[in-house]
């Protein structure tokens, strides 16, 4: 078994392939996000499964119509992403589809009694909002002591070369997390370990400063019964629906941290008063129905059947 660190795209790709039959992908070249002519196979149906945001370097070849014309279909993981690519690159809509992300259904979800310290969790990369969360935690520590923020964050998921080149940029941030009251820094963890941690957590706290195209970590958290507190940046409103506490994005990170702290203070109080119980039941049922692989795999099979049939006609 491959135990090397994996990011969300790698996890989703692995989960998809494990649920498809060989015949589902017969004659299909499924390209993960990177837009480059070297990845095109002329004798196959070329599908770009696009997880990247429209502004990422590896997506910029979408400006090249020669590349776009060689791709048979583009699959986007949210309607937000589809529309951003449509606006920036004038993508051909007739070969564009939206198939949202998914996660395996959670079982044996156990939350500790909320009379103890509430367990908050952050599971994203450090540059997507950890510095804001750290500052918000420092602010919140001045007002209350009934919570604990567990941080699962590292540069490991992008490989050893990236870690060597960029990892030291975040050592100071990680050290501050380790030395901040009511923060517990875990660093890197496998997806299985992350899933166990979110199933035991009460709140998922993500003051995102990155335009997510979907956000697998949020899908996992909401499926596991965490109330999510995040920003309304990128595709997060689409991913979270009406279940999360949404903070209006603010480019001034100090002001964003203050805003996030204020919102989180209210959420903690409401959670202790059992104000989210009904919502969380609805939320878990919703994500089990609409964001589980039990549902999504049928959409993928239908899509792959469609593209193979079109090729034959």
Protein language model features and the residues they cover:
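Conserved donor-binding/catalytic core segment of Leloir-type glycosyltransferases
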Residues: 112-129, 134-137, 141, 150
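Short hydrophobic beta-strand element within catalytic cores of glycosyltransferases
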Residues: 227-230
């Amino acid at each position: 078994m491959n135990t090397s660190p994996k990011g969300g795209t790698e996890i989703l790709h692995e989960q998809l392939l494990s649920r498809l039959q060989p015949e589902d992908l017969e004659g299909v070249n499924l390209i993960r996000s990177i837009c480059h002519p070297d990845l095109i196979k002329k004798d196959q149906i070329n599908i770009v499964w696009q997880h990247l945001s429209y502004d990422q370097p590896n997506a910029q070849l979408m400006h090249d119509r020669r590349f776009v014309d060689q791709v048979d279909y583009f699959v986007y993981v949210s309607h937000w992403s589809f529309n951003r690519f449509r606006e920036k690159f004038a993508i051909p809509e007739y070969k564009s589809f939206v198939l949202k992300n998914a996660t395996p259904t959670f079982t044996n979800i156990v939350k500790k009694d909320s009379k103890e310290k509430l367990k908050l969790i952050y599971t994203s990369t450090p540059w997507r909002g950890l510095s804001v969360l750290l500052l918000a935690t420092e602010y919140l520590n001045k007002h209350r002591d009934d919570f604990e923020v567990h941080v699962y964050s590292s540069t490991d998921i992008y490989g050893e070369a990236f870690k060597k080149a960029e990892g030291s940029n975040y050592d100071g941030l990680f050290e501050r997390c380790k030395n901040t009251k009511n923060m517990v820094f875990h660093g890197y963890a496998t997806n299985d370990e992350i899933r166990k941690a979110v199933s035991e957590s009460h709140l998922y706290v993500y003051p995102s400063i990155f335009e997510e195209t979907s956000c697998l970590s949020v899908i996992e958290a909401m499926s596991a019964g965490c109330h999510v507190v995040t920003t309304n940046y990128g595709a997060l409103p689409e991913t979270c629906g009406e279940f999360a506490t949404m903070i209006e994005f603010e480019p001034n990170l100090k002001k964003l941290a203050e805003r996030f702290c204020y919102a989180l203070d209210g959420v903690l109080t409401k959670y202790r008063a059992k104000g989210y119980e009904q919502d969380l039941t609805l939320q878990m049922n919703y994500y089990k129905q609409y964001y589980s692989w039990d549902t999504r795999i049928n959409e993928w099979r239908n899509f792959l059947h469609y593209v193979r049939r079109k090729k034959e006609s």
